[in-house]
Amino acid sequence: MYIFIVNPASRSGHASQIWTEIETLLKERNILYRVYFTSHRGHGTKLAQQLTKDLSSRTTLIVVGGDGTVNEVLNGIEHPEHIILGYIPTGSGNDFAKGMALPSDPQKALELILSPNSYRTVDIGVLKYSEKDTKKIRKFAVSTGIGFDAAICHQALVSRLKVLLNRIHLGKLSYAFISLRELALHKPCRCRISFDNGTEVTFEKLHFAAVMNQPFEGGGFRFCPNAQNNDGKLDLCMIHDVSKIKLLFLMAIGLFGWHTSLKGVDTFRCKQVHIHTSAPMPVHADGESAFLQDAISVTCEQERLLMITPQTIQK
């Protein structure tokens, strides 16, 4: 029995058509399955909680949607030790699929799930912050971040332009347009960053800090090109003390991972990091908003989730 959680609104509704094709294949092969559809933001978390809270044996749970849908399901899984996770990417960015080397073609992704040839136990990141004096925890599979990149994520969630571009399969361009708009509004902050090995750094003007569990975020940006999601560590990229024009340049070459050795860029690898800023800045987890924060903590939970993959990555 396979359990599917489907976000029919993914990529401006294109996922609904993809699910129809997938369901046709399942019925043709007489494969037993159950399907649940998300209907609003956060629904994937509630569905995952309901479906996994009483599990006592291995169950294959398959997500059909974008990175945001994966994040919602991840935050709802009650017993990860009983879950085998499959993923059919239907979003506009699909960074999680890129990092896992999963097929972008939905039918090929389904074939991989139905006839898996390898598995990988992946790390999960955990973001901790406060909201109205309440401590919040949000898990992530791809990345979390604070500052300019998170501001772009916030706007992408509500952007009508992204919806329009998704309909003509140009959704990735929306990030470029949003970046230019947010650049005019962006204000860097002084920050202090502490790592689990005792190292501490301060920057006068932090533009953003990206904490990554795998190489890709934001539709393909490679801010931490050497990040691996099965090494028990997180990779951190900080862009600081540069002009807005150079910030834009560094982000542009960040698509190829060419920025890491340039002035104004620092990278670290760690198991835990604490970030404090002089003023609240936007925060995201897998592109989902965690609003404005001036203090966050991020940790890595090693080998927490079993994934169906096309190949095994050696540590």
Spans of features found by a protein language model:
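Catalytic core of DAGKc-family lipid kinases
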Residues: 29, 79-86, 91-205
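ATP/nucleoside-binding phosphotransfer catalytic cores, i.e., glycine-rich phosphate-binding loops
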Residues: 15, 195-197, 203, 222-315
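Glycine-rich phosphate/pyrophosphate-binding beta-alpha loops
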Residues: 145, 149, 208-224
